Amino acid sequence: MRDKIVLIDGHSILNRAFYGVPDLTNSEGLHTNAVYGFLNIMFKILDEERPDYLTVTFDVHAPTFRHEMFADYKGTRKPMAEELRQQVPVIKDVLRAMHIEVIEKAGLEADDLLGTLSHRCEEKGMDVSIISGDRDTLQLATEHIKIRIPKTKQGKTEVEDYYAADVQERYGVTPKEFIDVKALMGDTADNIPGVPGVGEKTATKIIQQYQTIENAYEHVDELKPPRASKNLKEFWEQAQLSKTLATIKLDADITFELENARHENPYTKEAHELFQRLEFKNLLGRFDVEASVNDVEKYFREVTGKEEIEKVFKEAEKAETVGVAFSKDAGNVLPLFAHASGYGRVSLCYEAEKIVTIPCDMDADFEYLTGKLSHLAKSVKRFSMCGLKEYLEWLPELTSENGFDVIVAAYLLNPLKNDYNAEDVAREHLNLLIDEKLDEGTKSCYEAYTAYACVPVLEKKLEENGMFRLFNEIEMPLVFTLYDMEQAGVKVEGEELKRYGEELGARIVELEKEIYEMAGEEFNINSPKQLGMILFEKLEMPHAKKTKTGYSTAADVLDKLAPEYPIVAKILEYRQLAKLKSTYADGLANYIGMDGRIHSKFNQTITATGRISSTEPNLQNIPVRMELGRLIRKVFVPKEGCVFVDADYSQIELRILAHCSGDEQLIQAYREARDIHRMTASQVFHVPFNEVTDLQRRNAKAVNFGIVYGISSFGLSQDLSISRKEAAQYIEHYFESYPGIKTFLDKCVSDAKEKGYAETLYGRRRPMPELKSSNFMQRSFGERVAMNAPIQGTAADIIKIAMIHVNEELKKRNLKSRMILQVHDELLIEADERELEEVQQILQDKMEHAAELLVPLSVDMHTGKNWYEAK
C-alpha cells in the first residue's frame, strides 16, 4: 500500500477561509475567522485522507524569481486585508504547536514548494493530495497527485477533486497543457499578460489542436481566428514570458526531510492551549489531552465537619484578600437543605496554596456558611467574586468598599467582549486554562482561585489603563445600587395589562380584516414572501429587484411606500401592534412575580459604551414614539401609599458635547438656559430666532442629536426626508455655527486612530478595532463610534454617579422610597407620599451635581400614579 502525503497551500486556504467565514474575534480583539476556517478545512481533509505525512507551505512576503523576470507580476493585487494579515503568524504558531511541518522560502511561492514536494513524493512511490484554492495547481495533477480545491460558504466547506483525467474532462486539456492555455489567455489575478485578444475559449481550442504554444507558433499562419494568429506573432515573446510565469517549479532548491512531515498526533497540549486562547470551543472536542493539569489544582481540597470549617474561616479572616465562589452543585444538596438558593457548595481561596470547597451537607448547611461568609466580608480588605451582584442576597455585611467583582474589572479592560465568565478571565489574566468538563467541586475551586488571584492583576491593569478610580468609585458601588433596584422591582397591574393586551388583540383583528379587504384576498401578513407577492406583484407597487428569497418587505422599504399606499400604512401599524402584544402585553405577564412585581435584571457588563442594560425583561425599550406603545406604561404602578417620581436629564449628551468641545456659543446658550434647538435652527436656516418655525426647530433638533452620533448627510437625509445635498448643507451650516464642535469631533477620531480607543471624561475606554478595518463601511462606522463613545459613555458615567448618590441618600435618611428603574437618562422612584418633597429634593440635588461641567446639568421631573402619568 502506498504512503500518502497531504500538502496544503497555506496562504491560499487561509485566504479562502477568511472570505468564507464571517468575522470572528476573540476576547483579546484578535481576528480569528481565517484561522478557524483554515483549521476546519484542514480537519475535514485529514479526516477524509488519513495521511501518513502532512506539510503546509506558505509564501514569503518578498519578491520571487518571477518578479525579477517581470516586475509587474501580481502588480494588480490589492494589499492583504489587515484583518487577514494579522492571522498569518497565528496560523503558523497553531500549526507548529500541532507539530505540523511548515515550509516557506524566500524567492519562491507556495505553489513552487507544492510542485517540488509533490513531484519528489510521487517519485518515491507516494500518493499526494494538494489542498489549494488556486486552480494554477491543476497543472500538477497526475494519476497519483490529486488536487483538492475547497470552497467555503457561510462556514460550510465543499471540496472539488482533480486527478489528471478530471482536469482533461473539465477543461478539455491535460494538466501540462493547462500551462499553455494560461500562457495564451493570461491571468488577471497574477497580472500575467498572455496574448491580447485571446480569451479562454480561443486559447483552449488552440492548445487542444497544437498541445503547446511552441507548436502553435510553428503553425501560426494556420491559427484561427486570424486575430489570434496576428497577435501571437506580435506578442510571441510575451507569450513565452507568460508561460514561464505560469509554470510551477518541480525542481526548486529546498531541503525536505520526509520524516519531519510524519503526521501522528497533532492534538498536543500546546495546541490545546492555543485553541483555548483563540476561543475555538467547537474544536476542543478533538483533544484528549488533560487541559486542566495546572499546578494550582494540587492545592484543592474538600472540607467537611464543623471543626475543620471553623478553622478555615479563622485562617481566612487573617487574609487580606479572599476569593469566593458559590456552586449550584445539586448532587450535594440533601432534600433537607435544598433551599431556594439552589447552591450546593461554597469554595474559598485565601492564599495561593489554600483553596477549599465546602459542600452543603448535614454539617454545613447553606445558611451557616453564608453567615460565616458575611462575617468574613467585614474583616478582609478585598472580598472577591465573579459576578458579585448575583450573591449579595447572602452577603448582607458586604459593602462596595471591600467588594471586588473580577467580571466587572475584566469588562472595563475589554468592553467589546460579548460574555464574561470565570474561565475566560482566568485564561486572559492568569494564563490559566480551565477545562469546561470538570466536576462542579473542582470548577468551583478554580472560580474561587480566579477571584482571589485576579485581584492584584486586574488592579494593576486598571491602574495602568487609568480606570482604577472608575472601577472603585463608580462601577463597584453601582453593583450594590443595581442589586437594590433588582430586589425592589416594579409593581405591575396584572388586570390592566390583560385589558391592554385585549385592546391590542381587538385592533389587530380589525387591521387584519382591513388589510385582507384592500388586498382582495386573505394571506399570511407575517410571511415576507406572501406579503411581497401581494404588494409587488398583485398590487404592482414599485420595488427593488426580486432576490432568491423574494421581495424585501423590511420596515425601511414599507416606510417609503406608506404615504402613498394606505394598505402599507395598515401593515406597518399591524406589525407594531403585533410586536407590542407579543413583547409587552403577553411577554411582561410571564415576568410578574408572586409579589405582583417585575424584578428585571440590570446589567453593567454588556454595552461597549458603559450604558446599563435591562433584561428578563428589558424595561428600557418600552416604546415611546406611538401612543399605543406609551400606554403600556400605565400598567406600571407604585405600591399603595406611594407615587412615582420620574427624573430625566435634559439634553445631557448635548451638554456634555458643549463641555467637551468648549464651543463658546453652545456653552453660553446653556448657561443662559436658551432653547438650543431654536437657536440651532436660527443659525442653520439663517432666520431670526423669533421667526423659527416648528418644522425648522424639529429639523434642528434632529441635527443637534444626530451630530452627537456622528450622523452622515445620508443618514440625516433619511431622518428628515430631504435630499442628501440639503442634509449636507445643514451639517455644514451647523459646524460653521459651532466651530468648536467640528474641531472636537475631528480630534475624537484622530485620537482614537492614534491610541486605538475612545475615552470618556471619567477614563472609560472603548477600544476601536473598526478604525483599522480594510472595509470602508466598518471604518466609517468606527469613525462615528469614535465621535459618539466619549459623549454617550460620559453620559452613562454621570447617570451611574447620580444613581449611586440617590440610592445612598435614600438609605442614609432611612426613607421608605426606593429607586426602581433606570432608562438611559431617566430615573424612576417609587416615593412614599409622605416623603415626596424630600425625594424630589434629593433627585434634583444629586442628579444636577453628579458632575461639574462648564454648563449646568438640568433635570425634568414629573410625578404620577403610574409611569405613563409620571413620564
Where are these regions (language model features)?
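C-terminal polymerase-core module
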Residues: 506-513, 517-569, 736-784, 788, ...
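Conserved RNase H-like, two-metal-ion catalytic cores of nucleic-acid enzymes
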Residues: 5-6, 10, 16-55, 71-72, ...
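Conserved catalytic core of nucleic-acid polymerases
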Residues: 487, 599-600, 604-607, 682-815, ...
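Active-site palm subdomain of RNA-directed nucleic acid polymerases
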Residues: 462-474, 478, 798, 802-823, ...
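Charged catalytic and DNA/RNA-contacting regions of genome-maintenance
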Residues: 129-131, 138-176, 320, 345-352, ...
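Conserved "right-hand" nucleotidyltransferase catalytic core of DNA-directed polymerases
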Residues: 231, 235-364, 379-383, 444-446, ...
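Extended two-metal-dependent nuclease catalytic cores across DNA- and RNA-processing enzymes
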Residues: 2-3, 22-26, 75-251
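Function-dense linear segments that define catalytic or interfacial modules
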Residues: 348-352, 408-436, 445-450, 604-688
